[in-house]
Amino acid sequence: MHTSLTVKNTVIGSGRTKIAVPLVARDAADLSSVLSQIKNLPFDIVEFRADFLECAGSIGEVLRHTQAVRDALPDKPLLFTFRRHCEGGSFPCSDDYYFELLDALIESRLPDIIDIELFSGETAVRRAVANAQKNGIAALLCNHEFHRTPPQEEIVCRLKQMEDCGADICKIAVMPQSSEDVLTLLSATLEAKRLVAKPVITMSMGQTGAVSRLAGQVFGSSITFGSGTQNSAPGQIGVSALRAALDCLESGAD
């Protein structure tokens, strides 16, 4: 049975596709500027991409900047993401530092949702998921393929693996090499809609895959990511344009 998740009155996995805006900044001044630019945009969730910070190697500084995001947008669900270089992020770091940072964010209870990379060691991942949920934070397990689109059955298998690890939300992003690859991702999303009980997020990246960011309500992807001031992944559509497109496609979905 498919279940939804409610975070700060935002229902994920039911009704209309929710829009998350990635927040990308280098330092405190940059962060303040970006926050002022995005605060009136039509989004549902803010994703703080802390791996873009120049101070990403300091847990204390990451916490301080996360607090600033929380203070600026107190009513928006906050997704904390620290994407490592091996999964397409900006900051290369060890497993030890990665999980130490996640633990600190979880213990701070600043985020509402925390991003955890699936292929970071099953024992450590399961422990982080349990710790997040113990502290009232939803665990989003994710995986990114920046060079290919796996077969449909492999995509579904990874989403199921995330659910089996205890995820509250399961996310995968893949890179298409052809239009057929986009269809593979959409078919996998539709299959996961039937097989995975937790909310699923999928996307086919780049210009070729942009249509997948608009088709969530039809195929079963619960959140789409739209750029505010700067893209955090290939193929992101501006938040305002994304909202307008979804308004046309999903009218009456609620």
Curated annotation (Swiss-Prot):
GO terms under biological process: 3,4-dihydroxybenzoate biosynthetic process; amino acid biosynthetic process; aromatic amino acid family biosynthetic process; chorismate biosynthetic process
CDD domains linked: DHQase_I (cd00502)
Signal peptide from the UniProt entry: none
The reaction(s) this protein catalyses: 3-dehydroquinate = 3-dehydroshikimate + H2O
Listed EC numbers: 4.2.1.10
Amino-acid positions noted as binding 3-dehydroquinate in the UniProt annotation, renumbered to this chain: E47, F48, R49, R83, R213, S232, Q236
Enzyme class: lyase
InterPro entries linked to this entry: Aldolase_TIM (IPR013785), DHquinase_I (IPR001381), Type-I_3-dehydroquinase (IPR050146)
Keyword flag Aminoacyl-tRNA synthetase: no
A GO molecular-function annotation: 3-dehydroquinate dehydratase activity
Domain of life per record: Bacteria
Active site positions, chain numbering: H144 (proton donor/acceptor), K171 (schiff-base intermediate with substrate)
Pathway linked to the protein: Metabolic intermediate biosynthesis; chorismate biosynthesis; chorismate from D-erythrose 4-phosphate and phosphoenolpyruvate: step 3/7
UniProt KW keywords: Amino-acid biosynthesis, Aromatic amino acid biosynthesis, Lyase, Schiff base
KW ATP-binding (keyword) present: no
Similarity remark: Belongs to the type-I 3-dehydroquinase family.
Quaternary structure and partners: Homodimer.
Main function: Involved in the third step of the chorismate pathway, which leads to the biosynthesis of aromatic amino acids. Catalyzes the cis-dehydration of 3-dehydroquinate (DHQ) and introduces the first double bond of the aromatic ring to yield 3-dehydroshikimate.
Name assigned to this protein: 3-dehydroquinate dehydratase
Source organism: Neisseria gonorrhoeae (strain ATCC 700825 / FA 1090)
Lineage, top ranks: Bacteria, Pseudomonadati, Pseudomonadota, Betaproteobacteria, Neisseriales
